[in-house]
């Protein structure tokens, strides 16, 4: 009995030590929230990082929240309700900054316009978009600015050319809107764009083949948060860099497709293959934000908004955390 009692005591002590250690480990994770207004392969680096536990690896309990539109995300970020936003330069964030929000682009994972402008098969040229309708996620978010940049490149002006924007929802809903005829076209990521092409819809342009400067998907945060919480900022960037490296490795194809299929709610993993192929070379290795890309959108939106016109692109970018990543040898 003494031997049993002694072993039981040792076991109980060991169990208590492990339990306390696990509890301490769990409590040591810092809770942070990141928002995004889209759901496509552009966000795949986030999905993979979550599924692989890379944020936890770097001490973060990160909650990823999809919001319907940019203004809601910017309001939450500005108030401190959230700490990060994954997105591109848009009317929503430029408008918030123009009104005094303390927001900066801290990393650029996609520094170009990435996607396809898909239309019904009756439309053969960009000029035929006159008088037509375009599906967007919101009237100030990424989907809208993507479309505006494409129209600007083609020399089209929505007001003059009677082009209407229809707010439908996320990428899946926008694609469905084009499919059913609720809208004549939409700027879509490659996953949904190729799905429509396979059903006979026309791709007017692949934006990656066009010389349009743009700050695409990246990380936005409050400048004050960057100064007060550099360890959290660095943890997020390390996790995302490791995720993008994982995505580029062809051996990880099935895991990446599983993450994308789950996030986009596909019934079959195979439906994510088109998106996977675009993801492999989608993300920058050097994740410095694009000042020129920000400047291009200020030019476009500033034509009708004096406050945005007065913004300086250089003031909207803080690459200090990215420089720390480079010093660590992350790229």
Model-derived segments and spans:
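Positively charged n-region of N-terminal signal peptides that target proteins for export
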Residues: 1-6
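Bacterial N-terminal signal peptides
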Residues: 7-21
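Bacterial Sec-exported substrate-binding components of ABC uptake systems
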Residues: 23-30, 327
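Short, glycine-/small- and polar/acidic-enriched structural segments
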Residues: 27-180, 184-190, 203-207, 212-213
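Short polybasic/polar patches that bind polyanions
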Residues: 50-51, 56, 97, 152, ...
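Pocket-lining segment of extracytoplasmic ligand-binding domains
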Residues: 91, 172-264
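Secondary-structure end/capping motifs
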Residues: 227-309
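Conserved C-terminal helix/tail region of periplasmic/extracytoplasmic solute-binding proteins
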Residues: 298-331
């Amino acid at each position: 009995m003494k031997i049993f009692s002694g072993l039981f005591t040792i076991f109980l002590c060991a169990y208590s030590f492990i339990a306390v250690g696990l509890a301490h480990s769990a409590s040591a994770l810092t809770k942070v929230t990141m928002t995004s207004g889209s759901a496509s392969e552009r966000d795949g680096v986030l999905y993979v990082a979550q599924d692989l536990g890379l944020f936890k690896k770097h001490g973060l309990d990160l909650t990823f929240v999809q919001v319907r539109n940019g203004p809601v995300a910017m309001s939450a970020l500005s108030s401190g309700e959230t700490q990060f936003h994954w997105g591109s330069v848009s009317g929503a964030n430029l408008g918030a900054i123009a009104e005094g929000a303390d927001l900066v682009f801290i990393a650029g994972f996609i520094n170009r316009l990435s996607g396809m402008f898909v239309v019904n098969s009756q439309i053969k040229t960009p000029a035929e978009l006159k008088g037509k309708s375009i599906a967007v996620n919101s009237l100030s978010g990424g989907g809208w600015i993507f479309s505006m940049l494409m129209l600007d490149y083609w020399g089209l002006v929505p007001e003059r050319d009677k082009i209407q924007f229809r707010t439908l929802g996320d990428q899946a809903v926008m694609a469905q809107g084009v499919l059913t005829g609720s809208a004549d076209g939409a700027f879509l990521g490659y996953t949904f764009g190729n799905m429509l092409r396979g059903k006979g819809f026309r791709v007017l342009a692949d934006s990656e083949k066009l010389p349009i400067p743009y700050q695409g998907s990246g990380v936005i945060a409050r400048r004050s948060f960057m100064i007060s919480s550099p360890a959290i900022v660095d943890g997020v960037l390390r996790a995302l860099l490791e995720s993008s490296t994982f995505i580029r490795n062809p051996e990880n194809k099935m895991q990446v497709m599983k993450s994308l299929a789950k996030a986009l709610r596909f019934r079959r993993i195979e439906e994510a293959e088109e998106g996977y192929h675009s993801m492999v070379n989608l993300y920058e290795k050097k994740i410095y934000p694009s000042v020129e890309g920000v400047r291009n959108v200020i030019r476009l939106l500033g034509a009708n908004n004096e406050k945005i016109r007065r913004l300086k692109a250089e003031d909207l970018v803080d690459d200090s955390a990215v420089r720390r990543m480079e010093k660590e040898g992350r790229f």
